[in-house]
Amino acid sequence: MPFTAQTIVDQLQVLIPGVTDAEALGYVNRAYKWLLGSTDIKTEPLEIASVQYQQGYDLSNDILRTDKVLWVTGVDDQSRYTGDELTFTPDKEFINVSYGTPTDYSFYNSRQSSAATTDSKAQIWLYPIPDIDPDGGYPKIVIYGAVYRALTLTDSLSNAVQFEDAILARSKQLLFDDYDPSKSDYWEQKAAKYLRETLDTLNKRQDGLGENLIPTISYSRRTAQ
């Protein structure tokens, strides 16, 4: 089944107990408006018309590389959304994907060297979870990141925290080749610590970038020790 807005609504209602249809659709709508530059709730599948991967990586495989993170630059005023597909202009890519090393300011340097939009407010840092739509639609982590951002921009901060915790809990089941719950605490704590520290660092920045970069989860694909 294609990954649609309703799919996200259904999953939000599982992840956030008690959230209503209207609330969930509101989160999805805000996420889509930010991600697509669209004012409409889109219930049809999202399809990628073309995406350029700077280092040639395919999100459907090899999504996790040890000590690497995924960053995505988002929309700007010249981006276009047509029907069910995202379209790109040659000099203003709607979405730009690359891997980088997670140092304190690597995202800043990556943005400077990117061929995509120079608008700092269009960039979002996403740490990948290998939970990709098998039907070829939008990578779920991109949508989750946008929904997470929508949650943080509303007054439902407690919902955002629940959503964050739910993603963290889900991710540990996805990232270990031979998952063993009894051995996963170290990796879960490491990811949670990194997430909190990164959010704290971004919140303290004075250049206006912090509020526009919403980290989610970071793991390395290693067998739990």
Which sequence ranges carry the predicted segments?
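Glycine-enriched, solvent-exposed interface loops adjoining structured elements
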Residues: 1-225
